[in-house]
Amino acid sequence: MTSEVARVVALGASNLTLGIQTAISTARGAFGPSVEVLAANGYGRSYGAASSIAGRTLPGILQSGLWTELDRLERALTRAIIMDVGNDILYGFSPEQILAWVEEAADRLLALTSDVTITDLPLASVKRLSPAKFLFFRSLFFPPCRLSRDEAFARVDEVNAGLIQLAASRHLRLLPLRPSWYGFDPIHFRPAFWGEAWNEILVGRGASVPGPRFSPAEWTRLHTLAPEKRWWLGFEAGTHQRGRTLRRGGRLWLY
């Protein structure tokens, strides 16, 4: 095991949601089978506003119950992750607003731990998009968005520069995302690279930990678990979070 980290707090959206089982497995290998994982995630998640996909609505990460729970829990040696910042660009929020939300999230985490990692944006894979592919992915993932390709790319550059500056000013560990983790889809890690990606995000480049074991059964079960608060077609359908004990080890809170 690489350290005495007892708790992982992860903020993100689709990549965190798709890779949650690999992330937890990586945390077990790096930090032990009793590791606690608290995640504020979800497809299309926004850092500061409610987001809706296919009739399901989640509060912004800053408005989630994660922060109340972190205040309630006894302090533990914590590693925190900030990732998947790009959704808010396609929701139409300004770079200034997005960076203010991420800065607020970082400051809340820094009140709990100095061990905070932030990822940048996948500039290389995004900027490979032709006008036709940009329109396809914009329509697929963000149907209401009307930003042009050039407007979106300019905002991506501005937000990415702001993330780098935030990492420097707050002494966060900045993790540049590897272009090789992406394929046809420019914003989601390829499943074949989930293990490598989560090892670097959670443990760091060059660190050697037991390889994460992908479990389809655990992946499926984790994706059936409800977060603390969500709405389906306007009806609230969340679940109070007590820290679920996972069969393969660890405890999980979802927000």
Residue ranges and their predicted role:
Residues 1-42, 135-143, 208-255:
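N-terminal secretory targeting modules
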Residues 2-100:
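Conserved SGNH/GDSL esterase-like catalytic core that processes O-acyl groups on lipids
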Residues 60-192, 196-200, 204-212, 243-255:
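Alpha-helical cap/lid subdomain in secreted, periplasmic
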